[in-house]
Amino acid sequence: MKDKVYKCGYKQCKLGGKVNKDIAVKKGNRYYHSECLQEIYNKEQIRELFLKHINPTEIISLLNRTINQIIDVKKVSSEFLLYALEYVIKNKLPLNRAAGLYYIINNKHIKNDYMKQKAKEIDNKIRNKNVQSNNEVKFNLFIQDNTWNRIIER
């Protein structure tokens, strides 16, 4: 029996546009790849952060066009753009317009900080896997008598 195949609901799907039922994520009446749905959430969060912290009077269509241009045409990951915007807000760097997003994605300090953060996340994942794989508990019991000889040996 064939698996049911749905069309991914994300217009800019980078994974071929078709998603199998076993890996599909449903939101509303549409089915998405998990990566596509994460990108949609990231874009929404970028939009909200920009309008809340940077410029609430920015034209929405211009902001959307800029975000789509950066993510879809320039092939910058939505995670990096979200991180860069959070970095600008946290460090109070100057950013007034949506066109300024082009400049923050090329900032060397932001790129280096992002790479360090990603390296830490990967390191933590590796450590967690190693901890989970070593579930065997080794317990050794050494019975020692409490005598003056033991105190003198130390």
Predicted region positions:
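Long, charged low-complexity interaction segments
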Residues: 25-76, 133-154
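Short, well-structured alpha-helical interface segments that form or flank functional binding sites
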Residues: 3, 65, 99
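Residue-level marker of positions within ordered structural domains that often coincide
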Residues: 13, 38-41, 106-109
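Intrinsically disordered, low-complexity coil segments
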Residues: 15-18, 58
